[in-house]
Amino acid sequence: MELNPTEKDKLLIFTAGLVAERRKARGLKLNYPEAVAFISAALLEGARDGMTVSELMHFGTTLLKRKDVMDGVPEMIAEVQVEATFPDGSKLVTVHQPIV
């Protein structure tokens, strides 16, 4: 299977997001990379499901709460950006203050 760099990046995000999802399901608090991966993967999947950029920007703020992550992680993540593929092309999705 031949993948270009963008496809490899998306596969890595998905894999890391899956690990984070499983850890969260076991009740573990997510660290910085896990939290970013969890949010990023959910945004990519939302775009694939047909959500708009504005819907994803709101959706990204509902995924994790302070209780889901280790101390200090919410302050470390001012924003999450991911380039998602939509029916009309790729667009940058930015979620500001994703963990409240």
Swiss-Prot record:
Q: Where found?
A: Cytoplasm
Q: Which pathway does this polypeptide act in? A: Nitrogen metabolism; urea degradation; CO(2) and NH(3) from urea (urease route): step 1/1
**InterPro entries xref list:** Urease_gamma, Urease_gamma/gamma-beta_su, Urease_gamma_sf, Urease_subunit
GO CC, any one term: cytoplasm
Q: Say if the entry is tagged with keyword Electron transport.
A: no
Could you state a single Gene Ontology molecular function term?
A: urease activity
Q: What is its EC number?
A: 3.5.1.5
User: What are the record keywords, sorted?
Assistant: Cytoplasm, Hydrolase
Which reactions are catalysed by this chain? Answer: urea + 2 H2O + H(+) = hydrogencarbonate + 2 NH4(+)
Q: What is its main location?
A: cytoplasm
Give any single GO term for biological process.
urea catabolic process
Broad class of enzyme this protein falls into: hydrolase
Q: How does it assemble?
A: Heterotrimer of UreA (gamma), UreB (beta) and UreC (alpha) subunits. Three heterotrimers associate to form the active enzyme.
User: Which protein family is named in the record?
Assistant: Belongs to the urease gamma subunit family.
Name of the protein this chain belongs to: Urease subunit gamma
